[in-house]
Amino acid sequence: MELELLNEQGQAASKVDAPDTVFGRDYNEALVHQVVVAYQANARQGTRAQKDRQTVKHSTKKPWRQKGTGRARAGMTSSPLWRGGGRIFPNSPEENFSHKVNKKMYRAGMAAIFSQLAREGRLAVVDSIKVETPKTKALAAKFKAMGLESVLVIADEVDENLFLASRNLANVLVIEPRYADPLSLVFYKKVLVTKGAIEKLKEMLA
């Protein structure tokens, strides 16, 4: 599989050979969907909680007598039918949202995403991404010159200057290959991979 190598103006300067095991796989929509959903589910904190009729603050006093008033019978004000009452099926921190995905499935799903991005022209290669100073303005100007607005950069090494310069850009994420995830790959409009990162991705996903 050949990928475009971009220059500093964002134009295709040449081609770079990339492993077919990572960038030449067939697209498996069902597998990609499963991998993305599992990633989102496993990222949940699972701390949401609501109160049921037992835990909501209430009085155990019967609101009115059982018969003779003409109104519907009521036992206590914590009933889910009442305003201020508990929930019938409350959310609980004990809920388990985790989804298990086998390692082979995850690797195949990631490779399918990389391959589809390459086919759509949303993935390109650069020699390296470096900035001399930890200034956001410098990195923003570099991406503007390349015509990139929403970009995920997978660099073989992220130094301190690059990390500090990129962290305040809303539509830019700079990561090392080991931190690549399916949601980020799908979310950003363009994915830039450095030459050194290609080999690391091959070791991870091939």
Swiss-Prot record:
Highest taxon of source: Bacteria
Gene Ontology terms for molecular function: rRNA binding; structural constituent of ribosome
Keyword set, alphabetical order: Ribonucleoprotein, Ribosomal protein, RNA-binding, rRNA-binding
InterPro entries cross-referenced by the UniProt entry: Ribosomal_uL4, Ribosomal_uL4-like, Ribosomal_uL4_dom_sf
Regions of compositional bias (Basic residues) in chain numbering: 56-70
GO biological process, one term: translation
A Pfam family per the record: Ribosomal_L4
A GO CC term assigned to this protein in UniProt: ribosome
Region (Disordered): 44-77
Role description: One of the primary rRNA binding proteins, this protein initially binds near the 5'-end of the 23S rRNA. It is important during the early stages of 50S assembly. It makes multiple contacts with different domains of the 23S rRNA in the assembled 50S subunit and ribosome.
HAMAP family (alphabetical): Ribosomal_uL4_B
Subunit structure: Part of the 50S ribosomal subunit.
Family, similarity comment: Belongs to the universal ribosomal protein uL4 family.
Stated name of the protein: Large ribosomal subunit protein uL4
Organism: Methylibium petroleiphilum (strain ATCC BAA-1232 / LMG 22953 / PM1)
Gene expressing this chain: rplD
